[in-house]
């Protein structure tokens, strides 16, 4: 089982704010709704929409991702959509930020976060001891199991 979380430059206090928002999204059912819009029997039935009265006065946060891992993040036309995009938007809605998503090679996400080019990374990213040496992760927001299917 893999644990997915968002990554931040070490010591970035924004991670704690994200953890608080993630806990609220888990508690109020928003996280489950976002997941069910992409995985399971209700795909497409629960699209996330930002509340009309969202205050975005805290500025813009840039999310580094690799939009090639459907349903976590992928392109629909020129838009980057998916579970991570929706969760990140929901968090930014709670915290008062505009969200900007930057698509890049997966292997450059950590460097982008550490250099300040991006505020955080979200890309179906598995928490590993090696990655924890260079970035701080939020609390886990999803677990995934990878399997191989072979023909009998």
PLM regions with names:
Residues 7, 61-65, 149:
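Short, well-ordered beta-strand segments
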Residues 28, 33, 58-125, 133:
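Extracytoplasmic small-molecule ligand-binding "clamshell" domains
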Residues 11-12, 97, 126, 139-152:
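A conserved helix-loop-strand patch within extracytoplasmic ligand-binding domains
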Residues 2-3, 58-60, 69, 143-145:
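A structure-centric signal for secondary-structure junctions around beta-strands
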Residues 2-44, 85-94, 150-152:
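Extended ligand-binding regions for polar small-molecule ligands
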Residues 1-9, 44-50, 129-144:
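Ligand-binding "clamshell"
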Residues 33, 43-60:
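Short, low-complexity disordered leader/linker segments with a strong preference
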Residues 10, 22, 65-67, 103-106, ...:
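A mature extracytoplasmic/lumenal domain signature
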